[in-house]
Amino acid sequence: IPKVVEYKKASSFFEGDEEYEENIIPNIIPIWDHSPRSRGKSLVLNHAEPSYFARHMKEAIKRIENKPLDHRLAFVKSWNEWAEGNYLEPDLHYGKRYLEVIKKNVVEG
């Protein structure tokens, strides 16, 4: 049986003050469902939505914005890990909304 955690609740644990340090790179997680690969001992982030991803992204940007330019990095996990329910590619449920969050917060800033 997978462990199911609400994304909104879990996302507070994604961020830490250490991410303000110059050599620490934040990781932004859009969606997570490891149950197809884990057979029982898995984690599912329930109700992962673009609006929560946007909030998580804004927090990561806040943590890197005052770092030297060559340390202003954040990782987004992951482009197309469909087997782990961890992806940004457009889908039938949210369309391009995850990509639009990135465009709004990073490209248009």
Go through each PLM region and give its residues:
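Aromatic-lined glycan-binding groove of carbohydrate-active enzymes
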Residues: I1-S51
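Extended aliphatic helical segments
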Residues: V4-V5, V44, V76, E81, ...
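Generic structural signal for well-ordered alpha-helices
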Residues: K8-S11, M57-I61, L99, K103
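A structural motif corresponding to the C-terminal end of an alpha-helix
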Residues: F13-N23, R63-D70, N105-G109
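Substrate-binding cleft of secreted/luminal carbohydrate-active enzymes
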Residues: E49-H93
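Aromatic-rich peripheral "rim/lid" segments of glycoside hydrolase catalytic domains that contact
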Residues: G85-G109
